[in-house]
Amino acid sequence: MGSGPVPRVGGVRLPALIPLPGAAPLSAAVPAEMAPAAVPAAGAPLVTIVLGTRPEAIKLAPVILAFQADPAFRTRVVLTGQHREMVSQVMELFGLRADHDLALMAPKQTLTHITCAALEGLKQDFAGHRPDLVLVQGDTTTAFASALAAFYEQIPVGHVEAGLRTDNLFDPFPEEANRRLISQLAQLHFAPTEVSAANCRASGVIGEVLTTGNTVIDALLLMAQQAPVYEVPGLDWQRQRVILATVHRRENWGERLSQIGTGFLELLERFPDTALLLPLHRNPTVREPLQAMLGSHPRAFLTEPLDYDQLVAAMRGSTLVLTDSGGLQEEAPALGKPVLVLRRTTERPEAVSAGTARLIGTASADIVAEASLLLTDGTAYEAMARAHNPFGDGQASGRIVEAARRFLGIAGG
C-alpha cells in the first residue's frame, strides 16, 4: 500500500436537490478580451455555429464568445433543440443567446427523427442566412446532421474536437460513426491533441488539420473564475469524501447500468466516510433504474443535472470522479481529480496515457476494486491527481478564430 488514505476535500458546497435553481449569467467572469464586440459590418463573413446538446453548448460557448469578440465576423448561433432545457441553462450561464431554435425536441425521439428534422430545418435556415462557414462540435447526431446539411448546400464545415476515435464503430454508438462521417465532410479539422490530429490525417481527410487544444478547458477556466457556494442537504463536504459520478451513455443501458449501480452501493458500504453525488440524466432509461437502486441510501445524493458552474464546483470539491462522460475525462484532470472511466473503450487515450484517467469498465467488482485503491492508497491517488492534463491551455477558441480568418481570407487579427 502507499502513503495512507486519501484526505477529505472540503471547502465547496453543492446545490440543493431536485429541482436545482437556475444559474446566474457569467457576465462578470468573461474576460474583457472575450466580451462581445460592436456589431460588425453587414458584409462581414457569416459563421453559423450549430449545437443541440449540453456538452456541445459547454464546449462551443467559448468559441461563440471568441467569434463575437472579433468584428471581422458575423456570428449566428442555431440550436436544434436536441436537449433544449440543458442547453438553455448553459447558454444563460455564459450570457449567450440563440439566433434561431429549430425546436426539434420530441418525446422519445429517435436518431432518425433528429437527423431528418435537423436536415430540413437547417436547409431552411441556411437558405435565409447563408453562412460562409458552419461550425459543429464533437460527435452528436446534431453535429453530424449539421455537417451533412452544410455539405448539401456546399458550405464549408469546421469540425471542433475532430479526430477522436475508438476504432469500434458501435462503441460508443452512434458517436464513433458520427465523428468519422463528419471528418469526411469537413474542410477545417480542429483537433484537441496531436493524437487526434494524427487520427484525422490517417483517415485521409480533405482540408486543414490543426491542433488547437480542447475548448472544454477554455470553458472550464472561464467558469473557474466564479466561486459558487452551494449546499446539498445532508452532504458534509468537510467530513465526507465525495465521489462525483455521472452515467448516461447508450452502451451502458440495461445490465451494465445495473452493474454500475451495484458498484456504487458496494463502495458506500465499504467506506462509511464516503458519499456519492450522482446528477441524474433526464432520460428515464438511465434515471429510473439508478433511482430505484440508490434513491434510499442515506449517503447517495441524487440530483437533477447540474448547471455547468455547479458541476465545476462539484469537481473541485470531490475526491474522485467516476463517469462514462467524455467531457469529464478532460475537465476533471485540469482540477487535479482522478477519473475512473465506466467504459471499455475511450476516444481520449491521451488521458489514459498521461495517467489522469483509467478505463475500468462497468463490472461492479472492477468499480469497487479500482475506486478502493484510490480511496486507500495515497501514492496511487497522487500519481493520478498530479499527472499532466494533455487537453490544452485554455487558448483553443482563439486558435479556431485565427484559423477561420485564414480560411476565409481575412487579413490581420
Predicted regions and their residues:
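C-terminal amphipathic helix plus adjacent low-complexity
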Residues: 11, 18, 30-33, 39, ...
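Active-site and donor-binding regions of nucleotide-sugar-utilizing enzymes
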Residues: 48-51, 56-66, 90, 101-204
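Donor-nucleotide binding loops and adjacent catalytic segments primarily
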Residues: 88-90, 109, 226-317
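A nucleotide-sugar donor-handling region in carbohydrate enzymes
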Residues: 80-85, 182-255, 360, 380, ...
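N-terminal subdomain of nucleotide-sugar transferases
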Residues: 3, 7, 14-81
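A donor-sugar binding/catalytic signature common to diverse glycosyltransferases
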Residues: 136-137, 159-162, 189, 313-352
